[in-house]
From Swiss-Prot:
Keywords: Calcium, Disulfide bond, Glycoprotein, Hydrolase, Metal-binding, Metalloprotease, Protease, Secreted, Signal, Toxin, Zinc, Zymogen. Residues 408-494 form the Disintegrin domain. InterPro entries: ADAM_Cys-rich (IPR006586), Disintegrin_dom (IPR001762), Disintegrin_dom_sf (IPR036436), MetalloPept_cat_dom_sf (IPR024079), Peptidase_M12B (IPR001590), Peptidase_M12B_N (IPR002870), Reprolysin_adamalysin (IPR034027). Binds 1 zinc ion per subunit. This is Zinc metalloproteinase-disintegrin-like atragin.
Amino acid sequence: MIQALLVIICLAVFPHQGSSIILESGNVNDYEVVYPQKVPALLKGGVQNPQPETKYEDTMRYEFQVNGEPVVLHLERNKGLFSEDYTETHYAPDGREITTSPPVQDHCYYHGYIQNEADSSAVISACDGLKGHFEHQGETYFIEPLKISNSEAHAIYKDENVENEDETPEICGVTETTWESDESIEKTSQLTNTPEQDRYLQAKKYIEFYVVVDNIMYRHYKRDQPVIKRKVYEMINTMNMIYRRLNFHIALIGLEIWSNINEINVQSDVRATLNLFGEWREKKLLPRKRNDNAQLLTGIDFNGTPVGLAYIGSICNPKTSAAVVQDYSSRTRMVAITMAHEMGHNLGMNHDRGFCTCGFNKCVMSTRRTKPAYQFSSCSVREHQRYLLRDRPQCILNKPLSTDIVSPPICGNYFVEVGEECDCGSPADCQSACCNATTCKLQHEAQCDSEECCEKCKFKGARAECRAAKDDCDLPELCTGQSAECPTDVFQRNGLPCQNNQGYCYNGKCPIMTNQCIALRGPGVKVSRDSCFTLNQRTRGCGLCRMEYGRKIPCAAKDVKCGRLFCKRRNSMICNCSISPRDPNYGMVEPGTKCGDGMVCSNRQCVDVKTAY
């Protein structure tokens, strides 16, 4: 049985309470002092719970007072913080790459909530005392140990009581965006998703995250790798809490410290550094370590005010699923929020604007920030969903296999691992009538839990539809009657006419230019007249067919409708295009698009559909 602890934190009158004090977060001008005291919970009959085999408990509770009122903080260890194949890499003085697989599953990083507060959350490190933050009655409080020898004293304070290191707000370097207008976003938000789209959006998603610490940051922390690792772990724990609201789980799959020299030319030009890091990820990192997304943490001071930069709408892309972030603040949480902000760009989010709102003060995707922000705005959620439905990135749907999860298996982490029949979370969170949350075994006579071909704990009958056809180019999937799993998604053959002969099927979709224009520029947009596409025969402006080694290559006359896509609003005669300096494929006609009768785009050429597939 998992040990549960009740820790009573008694609020004490402290000589320095309310005065200024220097903490790890900086100079705090108002705080309260508390003394944590562990009191083990007792089983029925007064028997004390047995000590767990691990160093840190899976669940804990803390009771203390905030502003004179008692609160109970529930904590559960973030069991999925590290992937099963997590590695750490550093470099020897002679340049040799040294990679290890340290045991990190018995860690001290927790998520939690305040009892009886539905919207509360908490992120706590219990490695050496209690350090982190919790939300209580709409406000954010921080807790960290006081550096007093032989004392269990901790400080509790609000972020508003931390004196800023400087008055310059944190600014993201992203200036190019993918949105068109406020009206466009509002209209898009009013569109109704299909049931299949809703299922896709509601599906659990995973990001296998790789973090690189550059040599400048390494030297800033006096080459102390344990200190750097602890900071990074705290950052990922905070990011995980932020992204849980979007049904994303971020698993740290690797941490690399450039302990000898920088492996790229890290420079003050943030755009140049991002470009070089993206190339390094594609050419050097991915061949030796798989990951869905990577970020470079650097100690360099970027030119101007930006403290981070990322590609927009690029998750899963070998080069552009990347970001760079400056380690600009001693407050770890501020850097973590910047990391979450830049990852938000990778996931299709733009900067918030006037009508964008979230439950607490600042939102994660605000352009400027001097205070922490832990929630995404309504705009960010809509833009993120629109991006997911348009691009359907696949790497984030890869649910880890049971053999890839932490070994030995941990019951209660929502992953069905080796030896488990189901996993519906902790006993307090489990909503399943089919699964025993304590044992992670199916209830008596239950055949299944919550899979697509499971209904009331029994397999659905053979030929019951478990996944409807999404469109002309998809096929429905039917249950077998022998399994709870829905069969693998299959599609119509490539080249089959679709949408009343407007297009041809390609990998389960019907790519036509009209829909691509709407995805790029919003509702009410149409494809431009044919003469606009002749601009693709030239390399001036936005016309081109493809890029080769940074050089624009024009289209042949027969291929002009396989290059840049041109769209228009209403009866406009202007040839409009969409470009992104960081994504050469943005705004291009999609592969498989119809470019003439019996013709489709393949490798930027308009070819016969019969020979294309």
